[in-house]
């Protein structure tokens, strides 16, 4: 079948975005992997589908996310910003405020006058069973043994699971070595995204993220949210934090209460449109 798509990115975290409302789309894991392949397909970190919501009274669209390995996942913050720009540029909505259904629940997208997008990611989930993470009780950080060494990590779900490891220098952090080991750690039964966070000041961090099913990406929106939440509950960060990722900067705001939503603001860019037979 021939599929129309847009290639987009949020700070270099790139996506193939597909309108599945006005064209029939039913992707197998093999087809997702082909679309995501950077030599034989279009090339991307994730494939995003725009679908009709299951409950039109609660949301305007359904947002589905597939990693480059073909697996469907619950949430992607950078993708959410691209989703908002896509549905506006394609004329699917004229709204500035867009409620969207995801596998992790309803999120709210707000297109700002300058074109940036603020995403209400909802409240973080901090209890181990919500992440999911094997631990007896909720803590601000947890010891995690990896190949005989013990690391102190934060564990947060932003609709998808995240481990956050504080490092002295993000540039020299062992992302390629530790990332896949923590991602597949048995205490994370559904695997986990791994953030390496350097605290510059209470209002600024530097972050690299090893995404499950993808590897290291230039930016990760939910990873930025999780890092700020983890740093804030440990008393390291302010309510509003600039997060510098390899692909650029996001601004994250979280009041600090467990029930308070995490707000993420950043850009989204369309690179090109096209079609592909798969």
From Swiss-Prot:
Active site: 76 (proton donor), 220 (proton acceptor)
Quaternary assembly: Homodimer.
One biological process term in Gene Ontology: lysine biosynthetic process via diaminopimelate
Source organism of the structure: Thioalkalivibrio sulfidiphilus (strain HL-EbGR7)
EC number(s) given by UniProt: 5.1.1.7
Location of this chain's protein in the cell: Cytoplasm
Site positions (Could be important to modulate the pK values of the two catalytic cysteine residues): 162, 211
Main localization (coarse): cytoplasm
Binding site residues for substrate: 13, 46, 67, 77-78, 160, 193, 211-212, 221-222
Native organism taxonomy: Bacteria, Pseudomonadati, Pseudomonadota, Gammaproteobacteria, Chromatiales
Name of the featured protein: Diaminopimelate epimerase
Job description of the protein: Catalyzes the stereoinversion of LL-2,6-diaminopimelate (L,L-DAP) to meso-diaminopimelate (meso-DAP), a precursor of L-lysine and an essential component of the bacterial peptidoglycan.
Chain segments annotated as transmembrane: none
Pathway the protein contributes to: Amino-acid biosynthesis; L-lysine biosynthesis via DAP pathway; DL-2,6-diaminopimelate from LL-2,6-diaminopimelate: step 1/1
